[in-house]
A protein has these predicted regions:
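Intrinsically disordered, low-complexity segments enriched in small/polar residues
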Residues: 39-40, 49-50, 60, 70-71, ...
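Basic side chains
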Residues: 54-55, 405
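Well-ordered beta-sheet/strand-loop patches within structured domains
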Residues: 79-184, 189-211, 218-495
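N-terminal secretory signal peptides that target proteins for export/translocation
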Residues: 1-53
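Short, intrinsically disordered, low-complexity terminal/loop segments
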Residues: 2-3, 75, 494-495
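C-terminal segment of classical bacterial N-terminal signal peptides
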Residues: 66-75
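Sec-dependent N-terminal signal peptides
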Residues: 55-66
């Protein structure tokens, strides 16, 4: 049987009993980690002496925590007291951050990195343009040479690499990015992950539609490991697609949605007017390739739930969570145009419920948001706003049931209505501010095309690649819908 009583030597070593406040006063007098005014001598310590100072602080920190242990305080309480000291800094000299502070710090760092590399790839020409075709042909030549030379070496599974790392895997990434032109030739193929490589990784991530982090995370590693031969095949296949689609961009005003790129472009006589991020359908509910005509814009629309979504999603959700119906402001009717039923009298487990019709009231909570852009087509898909703005922060945005959610939907509506009498931008903003339900029919319908292009090249010559989210390229290495690691788990009751 284990004896849990304190060892006799520890009993003898235990200091006289003091109150908690007294103990803290004693320790505070000898606390070397408390902030003190910086002096020129502090700032001028050479590296060797700074390292010695850090070791001394580590020793003293251990002694402080040991004093708590000898006084009978549990380790968790000692650590809690220690980290709450004014100006507390861990041994490395950096302030301890809360999870929220660390996320915000990482987000700021990512934004700064993105702003540093994004201007290199900003192109004014739209996807469907002769400039894109010329750049794509040049990119095919470069990737032919890379493939002929044997391509690149894959990064081992589960490897992540970031600034200041140093091993052979860093050299693999450097050689890859030298081949693709993301890393300048003078950067070399050393084993060190330096600032030049961080910027090169960010460029690579931008070209592949990945979240810009500057380090080799899981999704970046997967993209790096697509063989050069498959990237070449992807470029060739999409050159054919873009060439065949060129005639669609020749209309006066036209809206193009490139589904796997999660991007919308509005064109006027071939010139780019507006570009926006979009959310598209999940792989099990694909956004179709479709051509239609935009005929009207709805402000504060109702959402008439399609029968398929009602049966697959809404009714099961109500059975699981009876409060969902009222909370999300739905109405239920036996047929369209009939009076709404009292949901408390509906037998939600009855098979007859599958034939009922459902409608969601207008409002910012509505699944369509505050704007719907109607484009009649056999697939009953359309463009609309969304209350889930945070989805646009994701780099992979296949979350819908097939319809397309537009980040800059107000700008798009304003552009569509600019030729309509009485609908300037301030009128639109007034309608939205007053929460008025309005439908504006366009005098001249605007063509809209949902297309599927997974590779192209920009005017700067950079080749861009996207995942084949619906498996339409027939290339194993680029197929899949790999979401960001922090992708949200969403309710499936959505258009």
């Amino acid at each position: 049987m284990t004896n849990s009583a304190p060892h006799e030597s520890l009993k003898r070593a235990r200091p006289p009993h003091r109150s908690t406040a007294a103990r803290e006063r004693v320790i505070a007098r000898h606390d070397m980690t408390r902030p003190r005014p910086a002096t020129s001598r502090d700032r001028s310590l050479p590296p060797m002496r700074r390292a010695g100072a850090r070791r001394l602080i580590a020793i003293l920190s251990g002694l402080v925590l040991a004093a708590f242990a000898l006084a009978g305080a549990p380790p968790a309480a000692a650590q809690d007291w220690w980290t709450k000291l004014p100006g507390f800094e861990p041994f490395g000299g950096k302030k301890t951050l809360s999870p929220e502070e660390r996320r915000a710090q990482n987000e700021r760092a990512r934004d700064a990195l993105a702003q540093r590399v994004a201007p290199e790839f900003q192109a004014e020409q739209p996807l469907l343009s002769h400039a894109t075709i010329r750049a794509l042909e040049a990119a095919i030549g470069r990737y032919q040479a890379i493939a002929a030379a044997g391509g690149w070496q894959p990064v081992p599974d589960k490897v992540t690499l970031r600034l200041n790392d140093s091993d052979g895997n860093v050299s693999i990434v450097r050689r890859h990015l030298l081949m693709t032109g993301d890393l300048p030739a003078e950067a070399g193929t050393t084993w060190g992950f330096d600032n030049a490589l961080e910027s090169a990784v960010a460029r690579y991530q931008l070209r592949h539609g990945l979240r810009i982090t500057g380090f080799v995370d899981r999704r970046t590693r997967l993209a790096l490991n697509v063989p050069a031969e498959e990237r070449l095949a992807q470029l060739r296949q999409n050159l054919g697609r873009i060439t065949a689609l060129m005639k669609l961009a020749e209309a006066g005003r036209v809206v193009m949605v490139n589904v796997p790129a999660f991007r919308l472009e509005a064109l006027d006589r071939g010139s780019l007017v507006l570009r926006s991020n979009v959310v598209v359908g999940r792989p099990d509910r694909e956004t179709p390739e479709v051509s239609a005509r935009i005929i009207e814009v709805n402000f504060y629309p109702y959402w008439r739930v399609p029968d398929s979504i009602a049966r697959r999603d809404l009714i099961p959700q109500i059975r699981k969570d009876p409060g969902y119906f009222a909370r999300e402001r739905f109405a239920v009717m036996r047929t369209w145009g009939a009076e709404p039923l009292d949901p408390s009298y509906v037998n939600w487990n009855s098979p007859a419920v599958s034939d009922y019709k459902f409608r969601q009231d207008p409002g910012a909570f509505n699944a369509l948001g505050v704007v719907r852009i109607n484009m009649p087509n056999k697939h009953t898909v359309y463009l609309h706003d969304t209350p889930l703005k945070e989805l646009f922060d994701q780099s992979a945005r296949a979350f819908s049931s097939g319809c397309v959610r537009v980040e800059r939907v107000i700008d798009l509506a304003s552009w569509l209505l600019q030729a309509e009498d009485g609908w300037p931008r301030d009128k639109i903003e007034s309608v939205l501010r007053l929460k008025l339900s309005e439908t504006v029919k366009l005098k001249k319908a605007v063509p809209v095309h949902f297309i599927y292009v997974t590779a192209w090249a920009s005017g700067t010559g950079a080749a861009h690649f996207r995942q084949d989210i619906y498996g339409r390229d027939g290339l194993e290495g680029v197929a899949g819908n790999d979401l960001d690691d922090d992708a949200p788990q969403l309710s499936s009751v959505t258009p």
